[in-house]
Design a protein with these regions (language model features):
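Terminal, non-catalytic protein-protein interaction segments that mediate quaternary/complex assembly
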Residues: 1-208
């Protein structure tokens, strides 16, 4: 409510956080479009630049048969597709537009939920959603959000995701003329990878 939950005991890739969120909100599933947003240049000028989704596009995306070249790397129906066009290849349900309208017109509803977990499309995604659904709540002119994350990389992924969804709360609050409230993070399978152990030991010795 009175601060922003950005980790301070290690570096946070803030530009990547902002770029990925804008990419999701745009509804894109092309990794090269994310690169354009992140690096601020046209895709034919940044063919050597990588994003956090490049490896998924080059491996799982290729294995699924999606277009993959220097200027386009498709990932299948990942987050942006589910957020902005759920259910159909073209003209599906725009969950972002709907939830903004619902928050504005019926703020007390308990149905302010956006889901990326489309069971029918999971096997078509280069990476099934780790942060699967989020719910908004309005009270006392404040907008709060709870995220459920099915799979949580506690060292790298979770600080990134917390910052991303907290930024989303700030964006929605501005649109709806509300104040940012609380962000609540909930994890299912929470893990630290073996190759992160030493870094985690070092990080927990630091003071925020």
């Amino acid at each position: 409510r009175n601060s922003f939950p950005a980790v301070t005991t290690k570096k946070l890739a803030w530009k990547s956080v902002v770029s990925e969120l804008l990419w999701f909100l745009e509804g894109s599933t092309d990794e090269r479009r994310l690169a354009e947003i992140q690096f601020g240049k046209k895709r034919n000028e940044i063919v050597d630049k990588k994003t956090i989704w490049t490896a998924n596009a080059n491996k799982q995306g290729v294995e699924l048969g999606y277009l993959n070249n220097e200027t386009q790397k498709e990932l299948g129906p990942v987050y942006g597709k589910q957020w902005r066009s759920w259910g159909r290849d073209v003209g599906g349900e725009d969950q972002i537009r709907k939830i903004i309208l619902d928050l504005k017109n019926n703020p007390n509803s308990r149905r302010h939920i956006v889901s990326a977990w489309n069971v029918d499309k999971i096997d078509e995604m280069a990476l099934p959603p780790c942060h699967t659904l989020f719910q908004f709540h309005v009270q006392d002119e404040k907008l709060s959000c709870q995220l459920y994350q099915r799979s949580a990389d506690m060292f790298l992924g979770v600080p990134f995701n917390i910052a991303s969804y907290s930024l989303l709360v700030c964006i929605f609050s501005e649109i709806l003329n509300l104040k940012p409230g609380d962000f609540i993070w909930t994890g299912g399978d929470c893990h630290i990878y073996n190759n992160h152990f030493e870094q985690v030991k070092e990080q927990i010795q630091r003071k925020p």
